[in-house]
Amino acid sequence: SIDPAKAIVLYRGHQTRLTARAISVNFSQFSDLAKSMEVEDLMARTRRRLGVSRGVRIGLGVDRLDYTKGLMKRLWALKDFFDRYPEYHGKFTFLQVAIPTRNNVEAYRQYRDLIRKTVTEINEQFEVPPEGKTKGWKPIEYIEGRVAPATLVTYYRMADLTLVTSVYDGMNLVAKEYVA
């Protein structure tokens, strides 16, 4: 039997209570890590490694490599942005962290390959090659794989904006992690 008023389901003598629980992140943990010297050092090293100078604005996406996350639509939007606003070439870089998932499923491997191919095509179309002492510029810095918590917080700290473009998602903590 079901008691909607008490949110209880009784089945074969077993009682199950249904509750809605808001999911969140540990704000203090993220905030403390973001203020740490480890993250400060990582920020400087990461900017150098990526060739992103202080004046360059950074956008960020952190997603599982899953079609529900809207990564292809995001990449198309970024391509459109760089097509329409060439004045942002060299002044805006999008850092995409893509965390592999379901690698044993062929459709997910094909999706991963499509994402990689699209990032490469966009970068080839717009990137500025290195000359002399300059590191050059790529519109999209693509990082595939799991990242350590301090590295993730470093990316959040470096970012001027983050995009969450899920087309179908039950819960997504990226926005909460970013503002923490």
Residues of each region from the PLM?
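Catalytic cores of carbohydrate-active enzymes across secretory and cytosolic contexts
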Residues: 1-180
